[in-house]
């Protein structure tokens, strides 16, 4: 998947800022290099997820950027997203691939080489690998695997590895050197005073 954008933005409604504002700011800078992953709180309704995803899809379409929906694959299908992303507690990878179809983008969370290899064999298009650093963006995460952990996974698979977990622009060079194709961020953009400027800094680091 060489055409996959290197910068992934995961939406965050907890930041006190409209996630659509952050998405628009990031898209205006990153354009096709941005992949927006629509993620809502566990207690959000499917209707809420659908409404947000539909609006994000409309924004992404203006820039020919990719939009995925995390966890709720039925919502991804309903809004016509490019695909989805599943974690350890979601549908098995093979089942997710069957739901989305062979042409869809399917991201899968993996934290070790064995899980990564199995995910790719079952149909993963790319892997979200981490957390690189301790993070509070999601409850119940395992300990951070660090840059070295990302490197172990990247060496084991041929699909793009997207590093995640409190990643900042300063982390990008060492993550890329370890084998990461790109990075996924939440707070680095959602909490930024200037999301467009923060996007530019991340892109500059990613395209060395």
Curated annotation (Swiss-Prot):
Residues at which 4-amino-2-methyl-5-(diphosphooxymethyl)pyrimidine binds: 37-39, 70, 109, 138
Highest taxon above the source species: Bacteria
Functional pathway: Cofactor biosynthesis; thiamine diphosphate biosynthesis; thiamine phosphate from 4-amino-2-methyl-5-diphosphomethylpyrimidine and 4-methyl-5-(2-phosphoethyl)-thiazole: step 1/1
Cofactor(s) the protein requires to work: Mg(2+)
Cofactor binding remark: Binds 1 Mg(2+) ion per subunit.
UniProt keyword Cell cycle, yes or no: no
GO cellular component terms, semicolon-separated: cytoplasm
UniProt cross-references to InterPro entries, sorted A to Z: Aldolase_TIM, ThiamineP_synth_sf, ThiamineP_synth_TenI, TMP_synthase
Matches recorded under HAMAP family: TMP_synthase
The name this protein goes by in its record: Thiamine-phosphate synthase
Underlying gene: thiE
